[in-house]
């Protein structure tokens, strides 16, 4: 009996579950960790990079993609599913520009992606998208935005959030450390994203991918050297803090 609900996308189980949607959410939990931070004049996306094969082109393995000049997205889950969603969202961004002669708001394109995902939970012959996405950008009035969508088609606005394999650990770190002081400058917001990822990424900066959008500026993907420099600064700050604590205890 349970198998019938297990296979059917559009049929609720007696206790109110849509199993295929829940399985899609499990696929997200197996994906690379991604984190989003909303600063005052900046939005930051960081992703845990999986180590690539020796002969593989590194630039072809990207988890952060631009949807428009002022909006970008990071995802956790099935890369092939994400490609479909990204392509559809890019077409919608361009279509909106041509029709309305204005760029999309971040909420508009998030709602479009969430609606697309929701449609795939209610249609026969399809399966839900196995991805969760963090969507960041600036509205044309200069307001920074961060949204998260999941396979069920729900979306919410956040100050900071994480998705993927170790989302719970990273989210707990952000809940403790996200303050106005922690995002006082652009550099502080970037460092907070790196610190959050370093909670779960063991091999330091070389396994982190970072993208930033500043107000009235296009998307910028940070170079590995820039990330390594910031990681070194963070490590130095940690050592100094530990030293101060030692001195306090001894006094």
UniProtKB/Swiss-Prot annotation:
SMART domains (alphabetical): Proteasome_A_N
GO terms under biological process: ubiquitin-dependent protein catabolic process
One GO CC term, this protein: proteasome core complex
PROSITE patterns: PROTEASOME_ALPHA_1, PROTEASOME_ALPHA_2
Subcellular location: Cytoplasm; Nucleus
Record key words, sorted: Cytoplasm, Nucleus, Proteasome
Taxonomic superkingdom: Eukaryota
Assembly behavior: The 26S proteasome consists of a 20S proteasome core and two 19S regulatory subunits. The 20S proteasome core is composed of 28 subunits that are arranged in four stacked rings, resulting in a barrel-shaped structure. The two end rings are each formed by seven alpha subunits, and the two central rings are each formed by seven beta subunits. The catalytic chamber with the active sites is on the inside of the barrel.
NCBIfam families referenced in this protein's UniProt entry, alphabetically: PRK03996.1 (NF003075)
Sequence similarity: Belongs to the peptidase T1A family.
Task of the protein: The proteasome is a multicatalytic proteinase complex which is characterized by its ability to cleave peptides with Arg, Phe, Tyr, Leu, and Glu adjacent to the leaving group at neutral or slightly basic pH. The proteasome has an ATP-dependent proteolytic activity.
Name of protein: Proteasome subunit alpha type-7
Gene name of the encoded protein: psma7
